[in-house]
Swiss-Prot record:
<comment type="pathway">
    <text>tRNA modification; tRNA-queuosine biosynthesis.</text>
</comment>
<dbReference type="GO" id="GO:0008616">
    <property type="term" value="P:queuosine biosynthetic process"/>
</dbReference>
<keyword id="KW-0949">S-adenosyl-L-methionine</keyword>
<protein>
    <recommendedName>
        <fullName>S-adenosylmethionine:tRNA ribosyltransferase-isomerase</fullName>
        <ecNumber>2.4.99.17</ecNumber>
    </recommendedName>
</protein>
<comment type="similarity">
    <text>Belongs to the QueA family.</text>
</comment>
<comment type="subunit">
    <text>Monomer.</text>
</comment>
<dbReference type="Pfam" id="PF02547">
    <property type="entry name" value="Queuosine_synth"/>
</dbReference>
<dbReference type="GO" id="GO:0005737">
    <property type="term" value="C:cytoplasm"/>
</dbReference>
<dbReference type="InterPro" id="IPR042118">
    <property type="entry name" value="QueA_dom1"/>
</dbReference>
<comment type="function">
    <text>Transfers and isomerizes the ribose moiety from AdoMet to the 7-aminomethyl group of 7-deazaguanine (preQ1-tRNA) to give epoxyqueuosine (oQ-tRNA).</text>
</comment>
<keyword id="KW-0808">Transferase</keyword>
<dbReference type="GO" id="GO:0002099">
    <property type="term" value="P:tRNA wobble guanine modification"/>
</dbReference>
<dbReference type="GO" id="GO:0051075">
    <property type="term" value="F:S-adenosylmethionine:tRNA ribosyltransferase-isomerase activity"/>
</dbReference>
<dbReference type="InterPro" id="IPR036100">
    <property type="entry name" value="QueA_sf"/>
</dbReference>
<keyword id="KW-0963">Cytoplasm</keyword>
<dbReference type="InterPro" id="IPR042119">
    <property type="entry name" value="QueA_dom2"/>
</dbReference>
<dbReference type="InterPro" id="IPR003699">
    <property type="entry name" value="QueA"/>
</dbReference>
Length: 355
């Protein structure tokens, strides 16, 4: 039984990366192999990633695009509000978090960015439905602000608008970036293609719940947020082909991992093979989970006590991740969204009863 304190660590605040490096691939890469004892830790640069993978392997990317989802505005009474779009639900509708001195009721008009009005609809706890006067994706792109994570202390600027998106982002809908993908630039993707490494994409729209803290000591009691994903048939076919030739399936980021494993678990439970899937998932991966698809994972360094730290601990091993994080802190790696990366290899056996 793991508790919340098992996933805590002390991080010097100066190791929280506040800005992106000048070049996407300039970050460092900690290669971690917990299948051997003691775990093998190799300090690399991200430009070395191609040398760590092989022709015939499959890299799976999340092609979601971050919305300019944050708005400041006011109620008709003049009271100030802050709005964070959680999910676009229709051409003119979205779910949002609203911070205000008093929660607005249905029918309330809100002025956003001093540019347009939205009307509050029904409450879908903990969110509010907002009705937009024009297509909401257009208004969000024109008037919204990029929703940088809460631990990044500066206001978003033009650099962030480029660097807090992956170079392959194509499906608008996220309110946080799939940050492992931020390290890839087009020359690296071209280099991987030339090596014979396969690439495929899925979509998982990352919600603000990714920053939601775990507030219970017994992690089994935590209620995971839900996110929408789309795993296409073309990816299913590439996974099958990769398995047939003995290659590794490598998830780029925890969001790609969660979509792949959610679809695979659903297929298992239905007694059928992996298939194209569009669905909601609230999958919560903790030590003891049996991974069905992913062999290796490219990921950033995660927050203490976070669900993502639990996920990587389940994947590579709790003690392996503890050792890797101690090493990263000693070696002054940069942490979180704009920080450095890890390349993890899946542990052979789960550490607790199967989930």
């Amino acid at each position: 039984m793991f508790t919340l304190s098992d996933f805590d660590f002390n991080l010097p605040p100066e190791l929280i990366a506040q800005t992106a490096l000048p070049d996407r691939t300039a970050s460092r890469l900690l290669e971690v192999d917990g299948t051997v004892a003691p775990a093998r830790l190799v300090d690399r640069h991200f430009t070395e990633l191609p040398s760590c993978i092989s022709a015939g392997d499959l890299l799976v990317f999340n092609d979601t695009k971050v919305l300019k989802a944050r708005f400041f505005g006011q109620k008709a009474s003049g009271g100030k509000i802050e709005v964070l779009i959680e999910r676009v639900t229709g051409t003119h509708t979205a779910l949002a978090q609203i911070r205000a001195s008093k929660s607005p009721g249905a029918g309330t008009t809100l002025r956003l960015a001093d540019a347009f009005d939205v009307t509050v609809g029904e409450r879908v706890d903990p969110f509010f439905t907002l009705n937009f006067p024009e297509p909401c994706l257009d208004l969000i792109e024109q008037y919204g602000r990029l929703p940088l994570p809460p631990y990044i202390e500066h206001d978003p600027d033009a650099t962030d608008e480029t660097r807090y998106q992956t170079v392959y982002a194509s499906n608008p809908g996220a309110v946080a970036a799939p940050t492992a993908g931020l390290h890839f630039d087009q020359p690296m993707l071209d280099r991987l293609d030339a090596m014979g490494v396969e690439r495929a994409t899925l979509t998982l729209h990352v919600g603000a719940g990714t920053f939601q803290p775990v507030r219970v000591d017994n992690i089994a009691e935590h209620k995971m947020h839900s996110e929408w994903y789309d795993l296409p048939q073309s990816l299913v076919d590439k996974i099958a082909a990769t398995r047939a030739r003995g290659g590794n399936v490598i998830a780029v980021g925890t969001t790609s991992m969660r979509a792949l494993e959610a679809a695979a678990r659903a297929a298992d439970e239905a007694g059928r093979p992996l298939a194209a899937t569009q669905a909601e998932t609230d999958i919560f991966i903790t030590p003891g989970y049996r991974f069905r698809v992913v062999d290796r994972l490219v990921t950033n360094f995660h927050l203490p006590k976070s669900t993502l730290l639990m996920l990587v601990s389940a994947f590579a091993g709790v003690e392996t991740i503890r050792a890797a994080y101690r090493h990263a802190i000693e070696q002054r790696y940069r942490f979180f969204s704009y920080g450095d990366a890890m390349l993890l290899t899946r542990r052979d056996t789960p550490e607790a009863p199967l989930a």
